[in-house]
């Protein structure tokens, strides 16, 4: 029993966001009951509903609430209703990106695994998916070619050109590498750093700095892999990977590939962290407005996002493992929502939340 209290800013957002967030609340209620942890939770508008109620996708009151909290549990934003707005005023770009910038969330964590009983959903061959895999992609989120200067277009005709610049500072690589190694210590103690050090100067520095940081983690095994080989190895033998450490653009590619080979995007959580371990936790999927309000959405990604919050921002590893174990038990027992049930009877969104909370309390 930890007898600790944490303040959580809860931002359900749009589409299926409120429905799946309600299930995360059930699970956190169960954690409170079992572990003696107290979560002070307040819900605030973000995204399309914030546009409707406040005239902008990210009200100042929501930002203030996040600043006063230990972590942010985020649902999903966006939908056809707001697509007519200018791009910067739409829910996705007007809410998530400013939040990441305001809180300097430089690290993105994307776990991807095949749960027992769901191997058939993977597009991989049965002999590969049957071996299972459990990977966390640690992606640098604020540097690299997406943000480097100069970038632009100039000239005309045959001489017209476009250019982007890949830039990484030593401190940016150091801080993301430390999170990768610390994450590995909580798992199977292996880090594979992805780069293109046979071609790119930025990757040469990346590899040098990662090697230096590795000296502080002698208990963690470090390997390096070129990005082109890594994309092939993920298809051939994903079980070889534990923590994959990536730059911004390589992490963008690798995390989506990892998501695809699980075969179940509705199951994948995501975390974005800053240097003080403050984090924003959200499902990797979208707001799915086509199924909103039907009580059929899969809440597992939202629930597992809450587990990541407990692990990385709150330091409650035992509670995080309880949630993940409860999810695995439910899935192994064939308790599935409509996206996974095929020809079997499907659980509703709320029934799935009830089941996972029940497994936590009975474990």
Curated annotation (Swiss-Prot):
Binding of substrate, residues: 100, 110, 139, 228
Essential cofactor(s): Mg(2+); Mn(2+)
GO molecular function, one term: 3-isopropylmalate dehydrogenase activity
Main localization, broad class: cytoplasm
Enzyme class: oxidoreductase
Known catalytic reactions: (2R,3S)-3-isopropylmalate + NAD(+) = 4-methyl-2-oxopentanoate + CO2 + NADH
GO biological process: L-leucine biosynthetic process
Enzyme Commission code(s) on record: 1.1.1.85
Keyword line: Amino-acid biosynthesis, Branched-chain amino acid biosynthesis, Cytoplasm, Leucine biosynthesis, Magnesium, Manganese, Metal-binding, NAD, Oxidoreductase
SMART domains the UniProt entry points to: Iso_dh
Residue numbers marked as site, Important for catalysis: 146, 196
Entry binding sites for NAD(+): 79-92, 286-298
Binding sites annotated in the UniProt record for Mg(2+): 228, 252, 256
Gene Ontology CC: one annotated term: cytosol
Domain of life: Bacteria
Name of one Pfam family that matches: Iso_dh
Keyword Metal-binding: yes
Pathway: Amino-acid biosynthesis; L-leucine biosynthesis; L-leucine from 3-methyl-2-oxobutanoate: step 3/4
Subcellular localization, as worded in the UniProt entry: Cytoplasm
Cofactor: how and how many bound: Binds 1 Mg(2+) or Mn(2+) ion per subunit.
Protein role: Catalyzes the oxidation of 3-carboxy-2-hydroxy-4-methylpentanoate (3-isopropylmalate) to 3-carboxy-4-methyl-2-oxopentanoate. The product decarboxylates to 4-methyl-2 oxopentanoate.
Family label: Belongs to the isocitrate and isopropylmalate dehydrogenases family. LeuB type 1 subfamily.
Subunit (UniProt): Homodimer.
Protein name: 3-isopropylmalate dehydrogenase
Native species: Vibrio parahaemolyticus serotype O3:K6 (strain RIMD 2210633)
């Amino acid at each position: 029993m930890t007898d600790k209290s944490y303040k959580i800013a809860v931002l359900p957002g749009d589409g299926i966001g409120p429905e799946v967030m309600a299930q995360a609340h059930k699970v956190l209620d169960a954690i409170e009951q079992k572990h003696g942890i107290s979560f002070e939770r307040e819900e605030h508008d973000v995204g399309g509903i914030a546009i409707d109620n406040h005239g902008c996708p990210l009200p100042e009151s929501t930002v203030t609430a996040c600043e006063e909290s230990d972590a942010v549990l985020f649902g999903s934003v966006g939908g056809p209703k707001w697509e007519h707005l200018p791009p910067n005023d739409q829910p996705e770009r007007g809410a998530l990106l400013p939040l990441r910038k305001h809180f300097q969330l430089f690290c993105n964590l994307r776990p991807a695994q095949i749960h027992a009983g769901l191997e058939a959903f993977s597009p991989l061959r049965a002999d590969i998916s049957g071996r299972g895999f459990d990977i966390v992609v640690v992606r640098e989120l604020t540097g690299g070619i997406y943000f480097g200067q100069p970038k632009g277009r100039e000239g005309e005709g045959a001489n017209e050109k476009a250019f982007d610049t890949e830039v990484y500072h030593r401190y940016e690589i150091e801080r993301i590498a430390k999170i990768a190694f610390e994450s590995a210590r909580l798992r199977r103690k292996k880090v594979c750093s992805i780069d293109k050090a046979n071609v790119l100067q930025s990757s040469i520095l990346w590899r040098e700095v990662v090697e230096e940081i590795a000296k502080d983690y002698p208990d963690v095994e470090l390997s390096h892999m070129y990005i082109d080989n890594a994309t092939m190895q993920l298809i051939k033998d994903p079980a070889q990977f534990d923590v994959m450490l990536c730059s911004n653009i390589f992490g963008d590619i690798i995390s989506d590939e990892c998501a695809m080979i699980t075969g179940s995007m509705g199951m994948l959580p995501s975390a974005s962290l800053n240097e003080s371990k403050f984090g924003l936790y959200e499902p990797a999927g979208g707001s799915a407005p086509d199924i909103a309000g039907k009580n059929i959405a899969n809440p597992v990604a939202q629930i597992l996002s809450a587990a990541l919050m407990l692990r990385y921002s709150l330091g409650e590893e035992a509670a995080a493992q309880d949630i993940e174990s409860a999810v695995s038990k439910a899935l192994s027992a064939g308790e599935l929502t409509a996206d996974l049930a095929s020809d079997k009877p499907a659980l509703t969104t709320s029934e799935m939340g009830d089941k996972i909370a029940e497994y936590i309390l009975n474990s």
